[in-house]
């Protein structure tokens, strides 16, 4: 079969389902993976028949290899991976728990680095799909991280989240340089996402467009980054912040 295969590693609250749907609508075969069965059940309801799932942790080499093996058993290959790390709970520098902090960094920085390595190893083992559609330089595969706004800007009460998201962004940039010679592109989508504790007034005063990014908007950005039309894009972050990073201060 000539359809590309996309892995979605981590579903988050809504974004993972939107990403999987968007790629499926583009004709991709899909495997979604998450440690929480209820999220996988939601994904099964959201996706068309034919999507595969993997239930297990995704922060170790073994867990990642198991997810890739599930994709290979279902579809025979992988072409794109979308990684959606967990958002850590709020805490502060002066009172964070050291053990919890260390585990969070292991999940973020180490988990991101392991994901790049394990996925890249598989991409390098397989033959490329025949080129179709728009003519671009062939790509071996793509890996895209979906990060929160804490990857580029911090705020009080979000210490561990900010450190972890910044660390993943560093892994993305360093990994993109390492894998460029192999035609594997690595990028990130950074978005202001809805949060349960954030009121509408927060975004109205701080975001020129007055709202957070929608899951479908994030998914479309990921789809573009993984497409042949973006074959010259690597090591970059596409920021969906409604103009927030351009604004000095707050709106009236």
List the predicted regions and their residue ranges:
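Alpha-helical segment proximal to the catalytic Tyr-Lys
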Residues: 121, 177-178, 231
């Amino acid at each position: 079969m000539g359809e590309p295969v996309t892995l979605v590693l981590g579903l988050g609250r809504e974004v993972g389902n939107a990403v999987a749907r968007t790629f499926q609508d583009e004709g991709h075969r899909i495997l979604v993976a998450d440690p929480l069965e209820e999220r996988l059940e939601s994904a099964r309801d959201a996706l068309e028949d034919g999507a595969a799932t993997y239930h297990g942790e995704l922060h170790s080499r073994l867990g990642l290899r198991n997810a890739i093996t599930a994709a290979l058993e279902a579809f025979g290959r992988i072409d794109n991976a979308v990684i959606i790390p967990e958002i850590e709970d709020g805490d502060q520098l002066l009172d964070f728990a050291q053990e919890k902090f260390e585990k969070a960094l292991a999940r973020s920085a180490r988990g991101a680095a392991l994901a790049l390595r394990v996925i890249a190893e598989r991409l390098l083992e397989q033959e490329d799909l025949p080129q179709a559609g728009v003519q671009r330089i062939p790509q071996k595969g793509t890996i895209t991280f979906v990060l929160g706004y804490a990857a580029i800007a911090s705020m009080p009460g979000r210490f561990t989240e900010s450190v972890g998201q910044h660390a993943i962004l560093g892994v993305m940039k360093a990994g993109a340089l390492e894998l460029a010679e192999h035609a594997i592109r690595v990028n990130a989508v950074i978005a202001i996402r809805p949060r349960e504790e954030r009121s509408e007034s927060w975004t109205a005063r701080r975001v020129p467009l007055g709202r957070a990014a929608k899951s479908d908007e994030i998914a479309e950005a990921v789809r573009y980054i993984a497409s042949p039309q973006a074959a010259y894009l690597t090591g970059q972050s596409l920021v969906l912040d409604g103009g927030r990073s351009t604004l000095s201060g707050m709106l009236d």
